[in-house]
Amino acid sequence: MTAVLPLPHPLADPAPRDPRQRLQREQLRLGKRLQRQVGQAIADFGMISPGDKIMVCLSGGKDSYTMLDMLLQLQRKAPVPFTLVAVNLDQKQPDFPAHVLPAYLDALGVPFDIVEQDTYSVVSRVVPAGKTMCSLCSRLRRGALYAYAQTHGVTKIALGHHRDDIVATFFMNLFHHARLAAMAPKLRSDDGAHVVIRPLAYVREAHIAAYAQARQFPIIPCNLCGSQENLQRQQVGKMLQHWDHEQPGRVEQIARALGDVRPEQLADRTLFDFLALGRSGDAPPDLAPDPGAWLTASDATHDSD
């Protein structure tokens, strides 16, 4: 008896036999995934409006390269017109390859500016030896970029923080500051003058790393502090990596939970009126007992014992 082998479906997409073709297909699939996630974040949070001038903060790292690449691709088919300008802050770090970004951006035909500000000397002078420079460096960098945005008609400032950054920041705030807070995908700066967006808010860092490697971006390492990482953030990062390895999908669930907050199931009295619960009839709030009276009563009870 002869076996009858099933014929392949005529519309099926045959798997490429050439490893290079397979790699190209995987890269194409990854690029489409990132485009979809970035587009979803832009839509969900209203990140881009018609006529926006978006300053893409380009550090030379994998995240900011990927963000610029995604925005350029989406710009060609976006439902609203907007312009991009790539801005890099030259902090005058020793041996910084100042030619890399201009050459890359010139080849792309992307409008760009290099803002020169010697924050390296300031940070090196102020921060004690052996201490992390990240916090001060970040504040100085943010101030310089905000100043550029103010004087160049920028309407949105795009930063390259991704999903893992947002989740890590949530745990940093939880563990070290006793508050439930992360990085908002879209926010107004503390001075009220700027709107900041994070188009990579839905994108995993591992996917960004794979995409950056596939695209062969000319990565510039941060040598200001030897690429040192804040120890606390490093510990949180290891925790998230362990979870991803042991319980795949857990970090994704945490990221999704940040968009599903139930104030009535927490304990923040500024977000939910707990005093109104159980109030009889239409009794006005001023008839409710003064919360301080309960403390007084408690103290009196202890004094009588």
Swiss-Prot record:
Subcellular compartments: Cytoplasm
InterPro entries tied to this protein: Rossmann-like_a/b/a_fold (IPR014729), TilS/TtcA_N (IPR011063), tRNA_Cyd_32_2_STrfase (IPR012089), tRNA_thiolation_TtcA_Ctu1 (IPR035107)
UniProt motif PP-loop motif: location: 59-64
CC annotations in GO: cytoplasm
Cofactor note: Binds 1 [4Fe-4S] cluster per subunit. The cluster is chelated by three Cys residues, the fourth Fe has a free coordination site that may bind a sulfur atom transferred from the persulfide of IscS.
Pathway this chain belongs to: tRNA modification
Low complexity bias (residue ranges): 282-293
Catalyses which reaction(s): cytidine(32) in tRNA + S-sulfanyl-L-cysteinyl-[cysteine desulfurase] + AH2 + ATP = 2-thiocytidine(32) in tRNA + L-cysteinyl-[cysteine desulfurase] + A + AMP + diphosphate + H(+)
Signal peptide extent: none
Cofactor (UniProt): Mg(2+); [4Fe-4S] cluster
Residue ranges, annotated region (Disordered): 1-20, 282-305
One GO molecular-function entry: sulfurtransferase activity
Alphabetized UniProt keyword annotations: 4Fe-4S, ATP-binding, Cytoplasm, Iron, Iron-sulfur, Magnesium, Metal-binding, Nucleotide-binding, RNA-binding, Transferase, tRNA processing, tRNA-binding
Residues annotated as binding [4Fe-4S] cluster: C134, C137, C225
A Gene Ontology biological process term: tRNA thio-modification
EC number(s) reported in the record: 2.8.1.-
Coarse class of the protein's main subcellular location: cytoplasm
Self-association and partners: Homodimer.
Remaining remarks: The thiolation reaction likely consists of two steps: a first activation step by ATP to form an adenylated intermediate of the target base of tRNA, and a second nucleophilic substitution step of the sulfur (S) atom supplied by the hydrosulfide attached to the Fe-S cluster.
Record-linked NCBIfam families: PRK10696.1
Family: Belongs to the TtcA family.
Primary role: Catalyzes the ATP-dependent 2-thiolation of cytidine in position 32 of tRNA, to form 2-thiocytidine (s(2)C32). The sulfur atoms are provided by the cysteine/cysteine desulfurase (IscS) system.
Protein's name according to its UniProt entry: tRNA-cytidine(32) 2-sulfurtransferase
Species of origin: Xanthomonas oryzae pv. oryzae (strain KACC10331 / KXO85)
